[in-house]
Amino acid sequence: MTRVALTSAVNLAKKLHDAGIRNQAVLKAISHTPREMFLDNALAHKAYENTALPIGQGQTISQPYIVARMTELLLHKMPQRVLEVGTGSGYQAAILAQLVPQLCTIERIKGLQIQARQRLKRLDLHNVSFKYGDGWLGWANRSPFDAIMVTAAASTIPEALLSQLAEGGVLVLPVGEDTQQLMRITRTADRFSSETIETVKFVPLINGELA
């Protein structure tokens, strides 16, 4: 990470703190992650702006505030094994991989998955397992998960993901179509409780796979 990038990432973390992010581990991960690595060169100059940016294939890299907020919500109970649905650029996975012992991440667009895998390898993040597949289905043979994060908006809460949560586990995801709400769902035995956190805007969670 260059000195300029490090300074920019540290300044971004300070802005996120001012915006309400309080988890110091999350802020530290943000400050140590070169966001420009996850963007095309043409957009690298915008890497440390607090905004979502396009990454191709109709997808985006999420606004840093949302990355930090969802991570903060996910870390509420110190999960050991985490599933991310929607690898995308790999930026959210890079943040999570610095904070949890084991991360599994699914991406339905093959090209994005390949790029993300290469980026995390360059960052020496080796506690991540990648899967090319349909995020609506989760990753059953790696379950149960202590926490699941979905980085695209589901029209309804995927039943497969609920079934793959460990007891006491949390699912953090945006739900809705035109109007979306960020939610945190907690599993207690066979019951689920939900919290609505805030209004958000994500690309839709689409089923199936795309080469």
From Swiss-Prot:
- Principal place where this protein is found? cytoplasm
Q: Which reaction does it catalyse?
A: [protein]-L-isoaspartate + S-adenosyl-L-methionine = [protein]-L-isoaspartate alpha-methyl ester + S-adenosyl-L-homocysteine
* GO cellular component terms attached to this protein's record: cytoplasm
Q: Where is the active site?
A: S62
Coiled coil spans: none
Localization per Swiss-Prot or TrEMBL:
Cytoplasm
Q: What class of enzyme is it?
A: transferase
Q: What is its EC number?
A: 2.1.1.77
Q: What does this protein do?
A: Catalyzes the methyl esterification of L-isoaspartyl residues in peptides and proteins that result from spontaneous decomposition of normal L-aspartyl and L-asparaginyl residues. It plays a role in the repair and/or degradation of damaged proteins.
| UniProt-listed HAMAP family | PIMT
> What is the name listed in the Swiss-Prot or TrEMBL entry for this protein?
Protein-L-isoaspartate O-methyltransferase
- Originating organism: Shewanella baltica (strain OS155 / ATCC BAA-1091)
Gene (UniProt): pcm
